[in-house]
A protein has these predicted regions:
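Gly/Pro-rich hinge or "lid" segments in bacterial periplasmic/extracellular proteins
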Residues: 111-115, 194-195, 200-257, 263-265, ...
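Structural transition elements
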Residues: 344-380, 395-399
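Extracytoplasmic/peripheral linker and loop segments enriched in polar/acidic and small residues
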Residues: 412, 416-427, 453-519, 544-545
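Long beta-strand-rich cores associated with HINT superfamily self-processing modules
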Residues: 517-545
Length: 545
């Protein structure tokens, strides 16, 4: 992606809306680029310039029909538990996301440049980024034969505002003041304030569309490319080709068995032995093994994925800002990058916006490794010469190795860290966010608004460190409705500063997505949203056996 420092004039919210409307009326991609004065820019560049409000060049996407139909594949993800769910609203793990994209569709869908493409929405119109009208495709049916209508969309979006749903994106959906059917195949969304990012928000996996009135999600009734043949939470799922899928020629595969192998070496062994065709979350140390196999390949994509040190701010010792700052100073970022991730990473700065992202604050001073200053702060906090447990698990990519490095650094500062290596099974349910010191792993989000809303807003269910900051919450709301891009960039920059300076999150690096793939799998590409092609591989790949 392009660093915004290299673009003299980023497209504003109003310009984005203007282009979006023109594209909806049939403007060509070339003319759209000319409108912005950037004719000749590559498609990837165009995606970052248009931003998430820009329309997708849906007709320019990879066309169906190029793949070979038929075949069954077996895929091994990293995380699984009895909490696995086919309810998109409750998706929490990469395993959930991958399954959800097998069985459901959204109104929009991200391409590999994080530009939202029209999917169940045939057209999206608006005049002020506050009231949006969505026209639905008329040729879409659910797996049970029911036709897609506006009522299904109203139900699917509205359920996120009900606390009983347990939606993981409930704070994000608070801006949806009203969602109503304005026709059999037309939905009107009224927001509390202008938000040019709506097409991007609608592409979030939690907002995939389900039939009106659904209460039993175990059957995975959606409009997606596959139907549920079997689903056993914590064990496996079997996805069977949807013969009535509304996208001509898709999907290619007849069946996908999806399992989880928590242990990374075992996952790699399963790939190399031919037991599975695809794996995600490959440890950089394993890339040589996969690369030496003539039958397999490594798929590497830089991303906004990060493994973070969580310092709970609602309990001691994290309540003391000196302790929190000391822990961040003990993260040797360059060593984490080279020793833990073998260079498959870029250095982070204790906030979730990755370098190269559109609103990345390049003026923010970099936190550097400084055990002497950390020692001073620990003494000031009354935390010198004590023993402190830190929870790590293979479930949080690289966290065990990072914890060991942190343990060595802390020793120099007079703090003894006791690394508790917890198993992957049950880590997210039983330990994540529940200890004074632990680790998380956050998959990339499509834009700053979604990232900040889900993980840093005071009342977000995934507010990992329990950080409460009224100024941050106010800026989040203001930035969401700001259509002047320069002002919006300033707000996001200030939010990064607040997180960097005050939040109990230490982000040493941003990690590349590394997948291992059988050479017979074709159509497989990278996506910065996450492994498994941003979890959307199911309808895009085929088996050339």
């Amino acid at each position: 992606m392009t660093d915004n420092k290299n673009i003299p004039e980023l497209i504003s919210g109003q310009e984005s809306l203007r282009v979006f409307e023109s594209l909806n009326r049939g403007m060509s991609r070339r003319n759209a680029l000319q409108m912005l004065g950037v004719a000749g820019v590559a498609a990837a560049g165009a995606g970052s310039l248009f931003g998430v409000a820009g329309k997708v060049f849906a007709d320019d996407a990879v066309a169906a029909g190029k793949g070979k139909p038929g075949g069954k594949i077996r895929v091994a993800g990293m995380s699984s538990s009895t909490a696995d769910t086919l309810d998109p609203a409750k998706g929490a793990l990469s395993t959930d996301y991958a399954r959800h994209y097998m069985f459901y569709n959204g109104l929009t869908r991200f391409d590999k440049h994080l530009v939202p493409q029209l999917e169940l929405a045939e057209r999206i119109d608006n005049s002020d980024a506050t009231v949006w009208t969505i026209t639905l495709r008329k040729d879409v049916t659910f797996h049970n034969g029911k036709s897609l209508t506006a009522a299904d969309v109203v139900f699917s979006l509205g359920r996120h505002k009900d606390p009983l749903t347990g939606s993981k994106v409930m704070p994000l959906m608070e801006q949806f003041v009203e969602v109503k059917a304005s026709g059999p195949n037309e939905v009107q969304i009224r927001l509390s304030a202008p938000n040019a990012e709506l097409p991007s928000i609608l592409a979030v996996s939690h907002l995939l569309i389900v039939p009106e009135g659904t209460t039993d999600f175990s059957k995975g009734i959606g409009t997606g490319p596959f139907t549920v043949g079997e689903f056993k939470p914590g064990v496996r799922s079997v996805a069977v080709r949807n013969k009535n899928y509304w996208k001509p020629g898709l999907p290619y595969l007849d069946e996908i068995e999806f399992i989880a192998i928590a242990d990374e070496p075992s996952r790699v062994n399963a790939l190399l032995s031919g037991d599975v065709h695809m794996i995600n979350e490959v440890n950089p140390r394993s890339t040589d093994r996969i690369g030496k196999s003539a039958k397999h390949r490594v798929v590497d994509a830089p991303s906004g994925n990060y493994t973070d040190l969580i310092i709970r701010q609602d309990q001691l010792p994290g309540k003391n800002p000196d302790f929190t700052q000391a822990m961040k100073l003990l993260l040797d970022r360059e060593q984490v990058k080279s020793a833990v991730f073998r260079g498959f990473a870029v250095v982070g700065n204790d906030h979730p916006i990755a370098p190269g992202s559109r609103y990345f604050n390049s003026d923010l001073p970099q936190t550097v490794y400084d055990p002497e200053k950390a020692k001073f702060l620990l003494k000031k906090a009354g935390m010198e010469s004590i023993t402190m447990p830190v929870m790590a698990s293979p479930a949080a990519t690289g966290s065990v190795d990072i914890a060991v490095l942190l343990q060595q650094s802390a020793k120099q500062a007079g703090l003894k860290l006791d690394v508790n290596r917890l198993p992957s099974d049950g880590y997210w349910s039983n330990h994540w966010m529940k200890h004074p010191l632990s680790f998380g792993n956050i998959n990339p989000r499509p834009n700053a608004d979604v990232m900040f809303s889900q993980f840093f807003q005071s009342k977000a269910p995934w507010n990992e460190s329990g950080w409460q900051n009224d100024q941050f919450d106010q800026l989040l709301m203001l930035a969401r409705g700001e259509t002047d891009d320069a002002k919006r960039a300033k707000m996001y920059g200030d939010m990064q500063t607040l997180v960097h300076d005050h939040c109990g999150i230490g982000i040493p690096v941003f990690i590349s997505n590394i997948d291992g793939v059988d050479q017979r799998i074709k159509g497989y590409d990278s996506n910065p949203l996450g492994g498994f092609m941003g979890y959307m591989f199911a309808e895009q790949v085929w088996l050339d056996a």
